[in-house]
Amino acid sequence: MTELVNITELLLSRIRDVRDYPEPGVVFKDITPLLADPAAFTALTGALAELTVRHGATKIVGLEARGFILGAPAAVQAGVGFIPVRKAGKLPGATLSQSYDLEYGSAEIEVHAEDLVAGDRVMVVDDVLATGGTAEASLQLIRRAGAEVAGVSVLMELGFLGGRARLEPALAGAPLEALLQI
């Protein structure tokens, strides 16, 4: 318990609030100070790796873009493969895609078709769970590829945006782990 409290305090101390960014009234949670601190970054990726191992994942999917920064080193520490999930049109070759709705419009994410297969247990890693749209689409994409969802792990969950409630049906019993609740 003390170790978790210490990690929580360390992570929180390295996240900067930027008021009125990207627009007035928004408080942006800037993780770049955390990434610049080797002790904090190592603690974060170590915690994500531990969750990956605990839930029996064989691969980590990192969501563009900060999910790449967190997911790749966590995958190395956990001894599992890393798969980037990109915005549509960014991956060469054969891909699987999944569209999802945004507040005003829609978006699409992709993964290389051969990167996820039956028998894979996949942990989704990202920096923030906000509304849950991208995470929900990634879970659909993982299952369409024939793989199993081991869970979703994020640095922080912005609870007031309702992402957890949106994800619950798509998780189908898989865990959602947030290191920080904001």
Swiss-Prot record:
It catalyses: AMP + diphosphate = 5-phospho-alpha-D-ribose 1-diphosphate + adenine. It is an enzyme of class 2 (transferase). Its EC number is 2.4.2.7. GO terms for molecular function: adenine binding; adenine phosphoribosyltransferase activity; AMP binding. It is found in: Cytoplasm. One of its GO terms (cellular component) is cytoplasm. One of its GO terms (biological process) is adenine salvage. The keyword Electron transport does not apply. Pathway: Purine metabolism; AMP biosynthesis via salvage pathway; AMP from adenine: step 1/1. Its main location: cytoplasm. InterPro entries: Ade_phspho_trans, PRibTrfase_dom, PRTase-like, UPRTase/APRTase. Keywords: Cytoplasm, Glycosyltransferase, Purine salvage, Transferase. Homodimer. Belongs to the purine/pyrimidine phosphoribosyltransferase family. Catalyzes a salvage reaction resulting in the formation of AMP, that is energically less costly than de novo synthesis. This is Adenine phosphoribosyltransferase. It comes from Streptomyces avermitilis (strain ATCC 31267 / DSM 46492 / JCM 5070 / NBRC 14893 / NCIMB 12804 / NRRL 8165 / MA-4680). The gene is apt.
